[in-house]
Amino acid sequence: MMRIVSIASTAAGRRLAERLPYPVEVGGAAAAIRSAWHKVDAIVVFLAVGATVRLIAPHLQSKQSDPAVIAVDEAGTTAVVVVGGHHGGNQLATEIGALLGASPIITTATDRRDLPALDAIPGFAAEGDYRGVALRMLEG
């Protein structure tokens, strides 16, 4: 089971966050993200994508260790996968979409084309140029 936290800085964000089945941190998003970063598998932030990117940028290390991050707009109309799409973010955005009536915004190329993500196959340890292989898969 994924460890997930919602972070809301405004009353509108808090109202939406409380509709989700995850613990809610209310207040300063920067401090809440810093506190949660190494403790959870996913962070749902009720902020614009640009603000979310600026807040998570100092914490980003690798696809394998960073939590998935979903940015939900304060109207609750979109759930954008910012990072971690292949590591639970895409599924989480879809679940949030169903719970809030929001559109999940998934931009990972393999998911958009129903192809397997080589770096997300359970038990598969990628060696060598797996990105080149993935690119060739996408090119057909």
Positions of predicted regions on the chain:
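N-terminal basic/disordered segments at the start of proteins
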Residues: 1-27
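Short, acidic/small-residue loops that bind anionic groups at enzyme active sites
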Residues: 63-84, 92-107
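Internal alpha/beta core interface subdomains
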Residues: 87-140
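Short Gly/Thr/Asp-enriched flexible loops that form oxyanion-binding sites at enzyme active sites
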Residues: 55-65
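Gly/Ser/Thr-rich loops at beta-strand to alpha-helix junctions
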Residues: 6-14, 47-54, 75-77, 84-90, ...
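A short, well-structured beta->alpha microelement
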Residues: 21-35, 128-135
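General beta-strand structural signal in soluble alpha/beta enzymes
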Residues: 24-28, 44-47, 71-72, 104-108
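Short, structured active-site "lid" loops
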Residues: 32-53
